[in-house]
Design a protein with these regions (language model features):
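Acidic, serine/threonine-rich low-complexity disordered tracts
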Residues: 30-170, 219-346
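Bacterial N-terminal signal peptides that target proteins for export
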Residues: 1-10
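Short, aromatic- and cysteine-enriched interfacial helices/patches
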Residues: 6, 24, 66-70, 211, ...
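Secondary-structure boundary elements
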Residues: 117-118, 175, 184, 194
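Bacterial N-terminal signal peptides
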Residues: 9-19
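An internal, short helix-loop-strand segment that often contains or flanks glycine-aspartate motifs
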Residues: 163-165, 171-181, 185
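Signal peptide processing junction and immediate N-terminal pro/mature segment
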Residues: 18-33
Length: 346
């Protein structure tokens, strides 16, 4: 994914640019970047739903030009938002490089929202258009630069067995960053409102979004972990079909195991598991594996503490949960302190 396939490969630009600059002993100055937009204030389609939880992440990654991996820390950010009330649930995923930290101010990011109501689901997504396939592509993109922004956008409505999808490539006067999410979401909604949607039938049993499918499998592993080791092992191989735009995918849980809580991990991260997933595109046959680590009990149950993804053979990306966790009001609190917000996965 599509969400992950969309969002994470852009970290390659920051990593490769950094590897090249270290040999020269110079780093270009990046313009100041404003603080992140608070999730509770973002004008997303699900803004009428109360924020239950907000969790933020730090992005790192590694590249392998030849035989050895080269790593770079703190080049980007991630954010997951849970919303919900009265039978409605929404997930928001924001991932990208931070132009203020990434070498040469590299700017690659994307945002996906899934807003599910009893009447149907809306999926809104936007990302920078660069999709580097090789290290050579990454270096060329980093050297060329671009003061204007170019983004792919999608607005899909899934209801009554039909996915109605509008897509568009949007250009902006300046290269909007991950901190400009609210601005870009407004532009995307306005632009796509005039694009005629294309209809695609959705077979019975197919879930209306990727994030919801991940949450469903995670919920299953949490229940299984509480039931015992045998129940957890039986979760392996479970698959959920979902639609994204006009295409069908299968999300498979290829492996899941209990792990030991790492030193320095939040005390709320109790009974953690490591789960391996694979996205399988039905049309092309392409496969995209990724790993999550998360607690199955306590205040962080169902919250990914580690996200790992390898979109290319030469690239690995990792997002680690920040030490603090955001409250429903958007302010950071200690991850080990009592929580009043409800985790929808618990």
């Amino acid at each position: 994914m599509i969400a992950l396939r969309w969002l994470l490969p852009g970290i390659a630009a920051a990593l490769v640019a950094g590897a090249g600059l270290r040999g020269l002993g110079a780093t270009a100055e990046a313009p100041p970047v404003p603080p992140p937009v608070q999730a509770a204030d973002a004008p997303a389609p699900a803004q009428d739903l109360p924020v239950l939880q907000v969790h933020r992440y730090t992005m790192a990654g590694r590249i392998r030009p030849l035989l050895f991996w080269i790593g770079r820390d703190d080049v980007g950010i991630g954010e997951i938002v849970w919303r919900g009330a009265d039978g409605a649930v929404a997930y928001e995923l924001l991932i990208g490089t931070d132009a203020a930290k990434a070498p040469r101010g590299i700017n690659r990011w994307g945002y996906v929202l899934e807003d599910s109501r009893p009447s149907g689901t809306r999926v809104l997504g936007v990302m920078t258009t660069s999709e580097e396939a090789t290290l050579t592509d990454v270096r060329r993109e980093a050297d060329e630069g671009n003061r204007r922004g170019r983004f792919k956008a999608i607005d899909a409505r899934i209801a009554s067995g039909i996915s109605r999808t509008a897509t568009e490539t949007i250009e902006t006067d300046r290269d909007l960053t991950v901190h400009d999410k609210a601005i870009l979401v407004r532009q995307v909604e306005e632009r796509l409102s005039s694009v005629p949607p294309k209809e695609t039938p959705v077979p019975a049993g197919v879930r209306p979004g990727f994030l919801g499918a991940v949450a469903e499998l995670m919920t299953g592993t949490i229940s299984a972990r509480r039931a015992g080791a045998a129940a957890l092992r039986r979760m392996k191989g479970h698959t959920i079909a979902y639609v994204y735009g006009r295409n069908l995918f299968d999300l498979a849980l290829t492996d899941v195991e209990s792990i030991t809580r790492q030193a320095g991990a939040p005390a709320a991260n109790t009974w953690p598991v490591r789960a391996s997933f694979e996205i399988r595109a039905r049309r092309s046959g392409a496969r995209y594996p990724f790993n999550l680590e998360y607690a199955t009990d306590g205040a962080l149950a169902g919250v990914p503490t580690l996200i790992q993804y390898q979109p290319r053979w030469w690239l690995q990306a990792k997002l680690t949960l920040n030490a603090g966790t955001a409250s429903a009001s958007g302010g950071l609190t200690d991850a080990t302190s009592p929580r009043t917000a409800t985790n929808p996965l618990r």
